[in-house]
């Protein structure tokens, strides 16, 4: 591959040197020769004697650019990590270097001042230091850099993933089996030359919309004077899922272009596959005072302001079209359609910045963000991870398909949905006790991670199966189990529609591999769990109870056959039904 230059620019303390070091370690692990021209090191050696006048700074950058060009000409990668505050001199280097990648490390002054251990920003702001870049000396931000990383809001690993994705897209570096791991441990593994990369997040970047430190305090204060939008249980969970990156690449609620293409084609406006509209609906009255280009505060049901939305769009959707395309029905008996029709007639689109969790986790021991699960998988050395979505207790059929999937993967993530579900679904706390008991007694614990998925259930069947798969990709799963009637309700979808819908995309577009399973049962012929593919015999040889039949048994305090459910799980369910009756 041709040589190239990665030109980091940004204010002092914005993370240029840190990211250059991380990127160089990752590229060396991919057998790319790298030379890093760090700003302080260059000033000590290459540019010794130069001052801080504009002329001297330009000379410094020209020297760095010349050396970087020579390194790239030799076929290597040169990285520069100087502030390089002036746009004209940076553009001059771009014009002279054939393969030039500008990375703008953006960060707000209050955040930089807070993280500045030397206290230079505070002194500059107080007037004690003169000619300090970004305070009383100008810094001209790039207008069209190849990559922008917001180091005040993103983790180092997330910023690194964005840079790598662009370098891979440009063809400057080889793709690595999957992608860079999004954790410090994984980065260390890469630096050591290990092949421990995980699947890339959807869109190449693990989004992080949390606001922290001084920026958080500033935004929270500003939010007090903004118009308020009330969140409900669904949109509260959506805010959290966007914030933690589970809905990557979404950075907020969809605008009308993304929304319409998702509804009609299951793609974002960029062309990236995405199957579910993620929208913020409001009443006519609430929408009336809001204008595109302004901000609004998002208020949780308990009265707290938890986020701010930067409004980029406002429109009236065709909800009948949305219902038919997404849920395949307009009947309000369908819980997804019922919710859709109950919400306001106006949709608001825009990126969000999140101050606080809308709802505290009911299961903190199992509450892991995508960045956290990725770090866990990397530390375990897992590369092939299969995700299993469930909103029900795990019975023998589920146990069978998860263990079958685990045979071809390094690890299994049991990822129960604990957000809003139907009123007749089994409560999340009861289900969690079932999962704990089952994993403790019937799984190899070192190969299984139990972690909650705090999203709302939408009951969109086939479309939601794709949505669930893409979310698990963001959590680091390379594989995803799709069983019979995934995310279905009633008789609105065919038994295997949720498997067949994946054929709408060409191989590789989704970036995650589905493992499709037929209905599993206990076969009296083979004396084990099986499917119609592996066990002969008619229906009389299959122990396969309906959900209604199981509920009747449990309500009477009777254990289902052990071929259907582990007795430990059944006892927990019986106890729950007795206590709730």
From Swiss-Prot:
Region described as Sulfate adenylyltransferase: 201-581
Enzyme type, top EC level: transferase
CDD domains per the UniProt record, alphabetical: APSK (cd02027), ATPS (cd00517)
Pfam families: APS_kinase, ATP-sulfurylase, PUA_2
HAMAP family: Adenylyl_sulf_kinase, Sulf_adenylyltr
Similarity section: In the N-terminal section; belongs to the APS kinase family. In the C-terminal section; belongs to the sulfate adenylyltransferase family.
Protein's name according to its UniProt entry: Probable bifunctional SAT/APS kinase 2
């Amino acid at each position: 591959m041709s040589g190239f230059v990665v030109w980091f620019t940004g204010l002092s303390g914005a993370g240029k040197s840190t990211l250059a070091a991380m990127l160089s370690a990752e590229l060396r692990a991919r057998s790319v020769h790298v030379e890093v021209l760090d700003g302080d090191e260059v000033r000590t050696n290459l540019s010794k004697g130069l001052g801080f006048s504009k002329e001297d700074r330009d000379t410094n950058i020209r020297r760095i650019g010349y050396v970087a060009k020579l390194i790239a000409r030799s076929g290597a990668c040169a990285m520069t990590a100087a502030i390089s505050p002036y746009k004209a001199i940076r553009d001059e280097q771009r014009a002279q270097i054939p393969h030039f990648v500008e990375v703008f490390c953006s960060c707000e002054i209050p955040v930089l001042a807070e993280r500045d251990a030397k206290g230079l920003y505070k002194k500059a702001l107080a007037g004690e230091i003169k000619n300090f870049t970004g305070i009383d000396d100008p810094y001209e931000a790039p207008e069209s850099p190849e990559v922008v990383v917001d180091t005040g809001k993103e983790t180092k690993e997330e910023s690194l993933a964005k840079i790598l994705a662009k370098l891979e897209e440009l063809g400057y570096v080889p793709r690595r089996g999957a992608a860079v791991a999004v954790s410090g441990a994984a980065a260390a593994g890469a630096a050591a030359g290990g092949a421990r990369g995980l699947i890339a997040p959807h869109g190449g970047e693990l989004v992080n919309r949390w606001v922290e430190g001084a920026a958080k305090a500033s935004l929270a204060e500003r939010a007090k004077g903004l118009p308020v939008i009330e969140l409900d249980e669904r949109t509260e969970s959506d805010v959290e899922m966007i914030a933690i990156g589970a809905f990557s690449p979404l950075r907020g609620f969809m605008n009308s272009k993304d929304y319409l293409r998702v509804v009609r084609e299951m793609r974002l406006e960029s062309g990236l596959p995405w199957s579910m509209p993620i929208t913020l609906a409001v009443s006519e009255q609430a929408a009336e005072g809001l204008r595109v280009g302004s901000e609004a505060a998002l208020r949780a049901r308990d009265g707290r302001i938890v986020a701010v939305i930067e409004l980029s769009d406002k429109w009236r959707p065709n909800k009948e079209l949305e219902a038919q395309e997404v849920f395949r029905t307009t009947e309000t008996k369908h819980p997804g359609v019922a919710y859709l029709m109950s919400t306001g007639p106006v949709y608001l689109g825009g990126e969000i910045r999140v101050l606080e969790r809308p709802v505290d986790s009911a299961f903190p021991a199992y509450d892991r963000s995508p960045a956290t699960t990725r770090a866990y998988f990397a530390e375990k050395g897992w590369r092939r991870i299969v995700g299993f979505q469930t909103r029900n207790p795990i019975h023998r059929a589920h146990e069978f398909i998860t263990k079958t999937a685990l045979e071809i993967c390094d690890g299994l993530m049991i990822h129960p949905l604990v957000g809003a579900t139907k009123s007749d679904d089994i409560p999340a706390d009861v289900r969690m006790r079932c999962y704990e008991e089952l994993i403790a007694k019937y799984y190899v614990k070192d190969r299984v991670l139990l972690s909650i998925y705090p999203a709302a259930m939408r009951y969109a069947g086939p479309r939601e199966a794709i949505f669930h798969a893409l979310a698990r990709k963001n959590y680091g799963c390379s594989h995803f189990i799709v069983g019979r009637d995934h995310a279905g309700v009633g008789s609105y979808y065919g038994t295997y529609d949720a498997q067949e819908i994946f054929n709408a995309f060409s191989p590789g577009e989704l970036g995650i591999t589905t493992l499709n399973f037929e209905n599993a049962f206990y076969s009296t012929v083979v004396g084990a769990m099986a499917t119609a593919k592996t066990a002969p015999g008619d229906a009389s040889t299959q122990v396969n109870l309906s959900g209604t039949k199981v509920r009747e048994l449990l309500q009477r305090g009777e254990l289902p056959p052990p071929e259907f459910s582990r007795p430990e799980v059944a006892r927990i369910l019986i106890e729950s039904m007795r206590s709730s009756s």
